[in-house]
Structure formats: C-alpha cells, structure tokens
C-alpha cells in the first residue's frame, strides 16, 4: 500500500511516500524567508506553502519511483498548526484525493510526532508493547502524555505559557542569534559551561519544595525568558559576547533539565518503563544525551526519532495514517474534513 503524506502545519512544506509501512521518499522544503523576521510570519508561511506544494509533492512521488495513480491513500496534517498553513496542505490533499478517486486520511500533527520515534527505517527497536510516556516538545508544543496501545491518550502535563522551542528561539533572539536559534544554541553550548549561570527551573522541586510541585508535570518557560533578559540587561555587550557559549549552555541546561526531570518523574509515578521523545526540540543533542543517561539509570527504554524525523516532516504523517488504518482507527473516505484546533487527550 502506497500512502502519500503531506505536512504544512508551520514553515516546512513536506511530502513523503510510505510503502507498506516503510518510508521510501521524504521531501522537506524549509522556508528561509522567516529568518529576516526572527520568527514565523503566518501569512508568509501560507504563501510559501502555496508556491511550493506542487513541486514538493511531485518530487516525493518521483523519488518513490511511482506514479500518482499508484497511490492508495492521501494523508495530510489537519492541525494543530497555523490555520492558513494547515489549510494549504489539507485543501491540496482534498483536491488530489478527489481527482485521483483515492481515500483521504486527516492526521493530527501532534499524534504523528508522538509516533515518529517508531518510523521503521529509523529505529532498530520495536515500539513498546505496553503503554509509554510521550514527551512532545517543539516550538509550539510542550506536552507529556500517557500513550495507550489502542491509540488513546491521557495528557498529564503541558506548558502553561511558552513552549520549550519558543524559549530557545526567544532567548536566542535576545542574544543576537539567527532564527531558528535552537540549533545555534545547541552548537554554541558544546563549547560552553552549563553551570556558568543558574537560570530558573519553574514548576520543579528545585523551585518549590511542596509535594504538589514535585508531582506537577506542567511546564513553564516564560520566567526563563524574563531571567535571560534581566541577565543580559545587567551586563555589557562585550561581556555577553565573551561568554556567549557559556550563556547558551546555561540556557540550554535550564530547558533540557526540566524536560528530563519531569519526563522521568512521570514514568516513575505511573510505573511505565518506556519513553518516547519527539518534536523539533528532540533534535537537541543535550536533551538526547541527558534523557538517555536518565533512562539508563532508571532502566527505562527510550525511543527518539532520527534527526530528519524530529522536525516537521510528511513521513510521520503518512506513517501515522498507516498505523491508524492498520488498527482500524480511521475511516479514510471523508473529503470534507476540518482542521483540528488542538490535541485532545
């Protein structure tokens, strides 16, 4: 079975073909236009998707060495995401499915991220046979949930203000780094001292001693942004430039340590021995290393997607559609689908 996946939820235009559960093409076109603005401009993102969608889909089909008529299913992100951006991909998928007389499967973007760790050409380890804890962490989302084998979810924690990826990008902007700042901070931090300055870890046992906070799996990163801004304002530009790698490492440690701490604590509280980490921030080298070390200490299995599947991509959309079809969790015949506003667990 050949499934075409389409992803346009933010600033990546992507199309992929999954054949019998294995990725055989995955084309991603990142929109560089947003760098000049220090963040994604929704209207520009939608226009870029409109400009790129045909060529990206054609490239994915050609790389798969098939014809469009060989496709069995069309799958597309139906949200959450930037509404205009989502609608470009979803409407294109609707039209393509209708023209080819193929079924259409709408896919939840967050759900696809959760299962991106199990894309077959990426992971040697099989998916866990029992429930697992999922940390989904990106520029727009930071969420912990329990994933059941019937593809149902229980959200146990989420950000109450800013997402972790946004914290990376906004603090990077304060430091004068290019957008997206996450990968730049990751590179700088390799040369820096993560203990150079202790930035706050909100909603953790380090910030409060009461049991309610130790059992709280929500996240908060707005205070970190304020702390970084205050730190920068009390030092001259020469000092900041001289210690840029140390500051980057300290910011990164403040973000990743909270993600690791809460994810491990959730697994321990609920007696679950498997964790998956996905989303754009899962590409961060410090997060991957720290989470692996913590899981090894606790005897927990860790599943993280390869770097290409960490950020937004259509392979995860097609793979999620394939999984839902295999488990009878979707009816792929509705051309009149509306975008999802959120992830419900």
Swiss-Prot record:
Top-level class of the enzyme under EC nomenclature: transferase
SUPFAM superfamilies according to UniProt: Actin-like ATPase domain
Record-linked InterPro entries: ATPase_NBD (IPR043129), Gcp-like_dom (IPR000905), KAE1/TsaD (IPR017861), TsaD (IPR022450)
Reactions the enzyme catalyzes: L-threonylcarbamoyladenylate + adenosine(37) in tRNA = N(6)-L-threonylcarbamoyladenosine(37) in tRNA + AMP + H(+)
GO CC, one annotated term: cytoplasm
Highest rank taxon of the organism: Bacteria
Binding-site positions, Fe cation: 109, 113, 312
Gene3D superfamilies reported for this sequence: 3.30.420.40
Gene Ontology terms: biological process: tRNA threonylcarbamoyladenosine modification
Entry's cofactor comment: Binds 1 Fe(2+) ion per subunit.
Cofactor: Fe(2+)
Subcellular location: Cytoplasm
Keywords, alphabetical: Acyltransferase, Cytoplasm, Iron, Metal-binding, Transferase, tRNA processing
Single GO MF descriptor: N(6)-L-threonylcarbamoyladenine synthase activity
Residue numbers binding substrate: 136-140, 169, 182, 186, 284
EC number per UniProt: 2.3.1.234
Similarity comment: Belongs to the KAE1 / TsaD family.
Role played: Required for the formation of a threonylcarbamoyl group on adenosine at position 37 (t(6)A37) in tRNAs that read codons beginning with adenine. Is involved in the transfer of the threonylcarbamoyl moiety of threonylcarbamoyl-AMP (TC-AMP) to the N6 group of A37, together with TsaE and TsaB. TsaD likely plays a direct catalytic role in this reaction.
Cited NCBIfam families: gcp_kae1, T6A_TsaD_YgjD
Protein name, UniProt field: tRNA N6-adenosine threonylcarbamoyltransferase
